[in-house]
Amino acid sequence: MRSWTEQSVCGRIFYLHMNGLISKDELNVMSERLRADFALPPDERKRIVKDRIDEILDILIMQYIYGNEDANEMLGINVDWSEQIGTEGTDTPGTEPYRVDTNRMESVINQIVADKTWRQRVEDWYASDNGTPDDIIRIIETESHRVYNDSILDVGEQADKETGGVYKTWFTMLDDRVRETHEYLEGETVPYKEKFHTFDGDSAMAPGGFSDPQNNINCRCAIWLTRQ
């Protein structure tokens, strides 16, 4: 059973993640651009794929930043990385720059999954006769989810090094769209360094990190960090 604090804050995180981190308006704008792109022949699409990749990269950077912010709130700490990057809103008077470990962020965003990076998958679909806008949207949503949760892991790792005793709990969306393998993990708490293990033999440090890509696509789960 989730505590009131876990339920309320997780609800906020889920709401932000599903309705704010990638807003419907943002996805609608991207979908319109993608539809225009995929109306072109593959040879012409190759000329504009870099623009879309840059736009997707901006989205993933924000996912990493949001994950850092939420993880700090979960643990009641402020992991202050040595590097900082400029992002939207940092020119506003009185607003501090977002601070993240840029090396960690780049490593997470550029992670190879099933032998390819997200960039390579986007390029493949743009070069394919069978590519569709939905294929790219699926990449954006899946990668955003992975980057967000991996960002939370990065803060958890740093906190565990500093104080020890960091644990993580797996939470699902508690609806009929949740996979049975993920429902199996609902509420499970493990030490930060351990993996979550499903009944089908797969495992992950966090949602979006399973060995089987089919366990990652369209996943909406999240982790909650605590110190004990």
Give names to the regions the model predicted.
Residues 134-228:
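Acidic, glycine-rich two-metal-ion catalytic cores of nucleic acid-processing enzymes
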Residues 1-147, 151-155, 159, 163, ...:
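N-terminal leader/targeting and assembly helices and adjacent pre-domain segments
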